[in-house]
Amino acid sequence: MKQLGKHIILELWGCEKQALDDQPGVEKMLVNAVKACGATLICVKTHKFSPQGVTGVAVLAESHISIHTWPELGYAAMDVFTCGEHVIPEDTIPEIRNFLKPDKVEVIDIKRGIVDIEEVLA
């Protein structure tokens, strides 16, 4: 059996509210997270909501990293989905912690695309 990708979901509670509403800061965090996990960045797009909140995605050659923030709740939801064996999604976590400074982080690990290569190639 082969795993085509790895997907971690991050539930980040008790984050710094100012960081959660900082669009340039969120964009920089995404770029730093891409570098930290060894992925190849294609592009980054962020959007600032009114009155608050930021959504962003880093499109990777290996998949994506996304974030959605709720500053009023001190909460952020993130996805780090990678394909290939050289990218380690968990390596993004220190960069994310450093910027958002969450009190609590829950990591949900999902193995994506479990296939029997020999069966597929037959």
UniProtKB/Swiss-Prot annotation:
The record marks 62-63 as: Cleavage (non-hydrolytic). Gene3D superfamilies: 3.30.160.750, S-adenosylmethionine decarboxylase domain (3.30.360.110). Binds 1 pyruvoyl group covalently per subunit. Pathway: Amine and polyamine biosynthesis; S-adenosylmethioninamine biosynthesis; S-adenosylmethioninamine from S-adenosyl-L-methionine: step 1/1. GO terms for biological process: spermidine biosynthetic process. Coiled coil: none annotated. The modification Pyruvic acid (Ser) is found at residue 63. The active site is at 63 (schiff-base intermediate with substrate), 68 (proton acceptor), 83 (proton donor). Its EC number is 4.1.1.50. InterPro entries: AdoMetDC_C, AdoMetDC_fam_prok, AdoMetDC_N, S-AdoMet_deCO2ase_core, S-AdoMet_deCOase_pro-enz. Is synthesized initially as an inactive proenzyme. Formation of the active enzyme involves a self-maturation process in which the active site pyruvoyl group is generated from an internal serine residue via an autocatalytic post-translational modification. Two non-identical subunits are generated from the proenzyme in this reaction, and the pyruvate is formed at the N-terminus of the alpha chain, which is derived from the carboxyl end of the proenzyme. The keyword Chloroplast does not apply. Its cofactor is pyruvate. The keyword Nucleotidyltransferase does not apply. HAMAP family: AdoMetDC_1 (MF_00464). Belongs to the prokaryotic AdoMetDC family. Type 1 subfamily. PANTHER family: S-ADENOSYLMETHIONINE DECARBOXYLASE PROENZYME. Catalyzes the decarboxylation of S-adenosylmethionine to S-adenosylmethioninamine (dcAdoMet), the propylamine donor required for the synthesis of the polyamines spermine and spermidine from the diamine putrescine. This is S-adenosylmethionine decarboxylase proenzyme. The gene is speH.
